[in-house]
């Protein structure tokens, strides 16, 4: 609240923050209509932001419109809420590199839906894709994570837990931490009695 007060956003009689021009601090949060989990998250966020004096409007669309038009063509004014998954070491080029911002010129290709641009991140993503030395990759990933945490191009809400069911006779298999099973470290697998 103090940061908003200092920035000139004071609460009116209804508890909504207004700037000096009398404009409310208001934005939309969008997701797919009918997705109960996301709709509940929207309601919680709306309630929490209201306590801070921010007017959040919930605006949802059918999935075919939300993903087929709104998200890919970047037609949301503030926040679009959806989930995505990736492997633990997938380089997030399509979501973070400025070359992957969907535009009319590239026929809406890429998944950098927020329009995030950072030349340092671009260079880092390009190096990570080709670096094979494990120690060097670790340093690069730490740099990437620090830039991400500073710039916050997307706001992760939570990580989904995925069940990983293994047969009792199989040993040495390490769950991947994401929904896709993998044959990584297959040399460690063994059939046991």
Task: Name the predicted role of every residue range.
Residues 10-24:
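Short helix/loop segment immediately N-terminal to the Walker
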Residues 8-14, 50-66:
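Short, well-structured beta-strand/strand-turn elements
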């Amino acid at each position: 609240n103090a940061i908003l007060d200092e920035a000139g956003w004071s609460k009116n009689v209804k508890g909504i923050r207004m700037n000096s021009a009398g404009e409310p601090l208001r934005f939309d949060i969008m997701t797919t209509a009918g997705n109960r989990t996301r709709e509940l998250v929207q309601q919680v966020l709306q309630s929490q932001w209201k306590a801070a004096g921010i007017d959040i409007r919930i605006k949802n669309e059918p999935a075919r419109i939300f993903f087929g038009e709104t998200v890919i063509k970047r037609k949301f004014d503030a926040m679009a809420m959806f989930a995505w998954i990736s492997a633990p070491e997938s380089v997030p080029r399509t979501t973070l590199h400025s070359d992957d911002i969907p535009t009319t010129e590239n026929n809406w290709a890429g998944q950098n839906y927020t329009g995030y641009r950072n030349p340092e991140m671009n260079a880092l993503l390009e190096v990570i894709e080709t670096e094979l030395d494990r120690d060097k990759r670790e340093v690069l990933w730490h740099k990437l994570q620090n830039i991400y945490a500073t710039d916050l191009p997307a706001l992760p809400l939570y990580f989904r837990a995925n069940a990983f069911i293994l047969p009792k006779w199989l040993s040495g298999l390490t769950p991947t931490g994401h929904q896709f099973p993998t044959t990584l470290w297959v040399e460690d697998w063994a059939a046991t009695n």
